[in-house]
Amino acid sequence: MDLINSTDYLINASTLVRNSTQFLAPASKMIIALSLYISSIIGTITNGLYLWVLRFKMKQTVNTLLFFHLILSYFISTMILPFMATSQLQDNHWNFGTALCKVFNGTLSLGMFTSVFFLSAIGLDRYLLTLHPVWSQQHRTPRWASSIVLGVWISAAALSIPYLIFRQTHHDRKGKVTCQNNYAVSTNWESKEMQALRQWIHVACFISRFLLGFLLPFFIIIFCYERVASKVKERSLFKSSKPFKVMMTAIISFFVCWMPYHIHQGLLLTMNQSLLLELTLILTVLTTSFNTIFSPTLYLFVGENFKKVFKKSILALFESTFSEDSSVERTQT
């Protein structure tokens, strides 16, 4: 995965390092770096607070368990933002070494896959709870949710391994070090055969990432919530619309925030430096930062009257947001 560094494979020796951010104006680079630093500070504090409340101050339910790990995926993503910002300020020079280069890319991939997988799991959980209440009463337990959580982390880690392997540091002739993908895992950067291999692997990685990390979860979530919405409209199962609003907010925020990333990665395949490529890169950095920082806050405040929110304690707000909907659990199909 590439947010700041867009170099994936090489066309010829004169374009040994192709990085779209080289074309960014200094003001744009400063805005991106400042946004990343601020997002890192805010995200660490807010997401850390949310995790503490969900883990130690609330009863462990399927809801709280799934949302805890969803927010944990966002918290992990905030840990890499300072590295992105520092590299951005140094014109994408990477001075943290090869090991951190690999960890950086692997963590970025892990954060993306886990967040979308947990959003899908939350959608499936709501689908089962609403349309299969009898099965849910018998099987939908924190232990069952723990197995789902374990499966999500294992799947996301497995899908992130290639990006951990392919990521390497590259030294150009001017002494600049970049953290970039070397899909052929070869030190022969100028070989035409290796360039062609890198291109094919890059295309394969893009397609698999787009299908598994975006398109398939999108269809799963759309199916689940279409069925849930139909059932809710038919029987008026929920006491309030808050649970549905919380999940829809999580879904919309994720797809709005990650869509620019996939568009940017698709544009990279065209190998054309353009204003659109530059704009999508800036938008990608800003929206993914927003996703990791503000999405958890939206879960808490959506559907609430702000005057009431500010009068509530943090714990009461969490309990109101993530409480199980008992009316759905009791409904029989």
Swiss-Prot record:
Stretches in topological domain Extracellular: 1-30, 87-103, 166-209, 269-283
Transmembrane regions listed in the UniProt entry: 31-53, 65-86, 104-124, 144-165, 210-230, 247-268, 284-303
Record-linked PROSITE patterns: G_PROTEIN_RECEP_F1_2
Glycosylated residues (UniProt): N5, N12, N19, N272
Topological domains, Cytoplasmic: 54-64, 125-143, 231-246, 304-333
Name of the protein described by the UniProt record: Probable G-protein coupled receptor 33
Family as reported in the entry's similarity comment: Belongs to the G-protein coupled receptor 1 family.
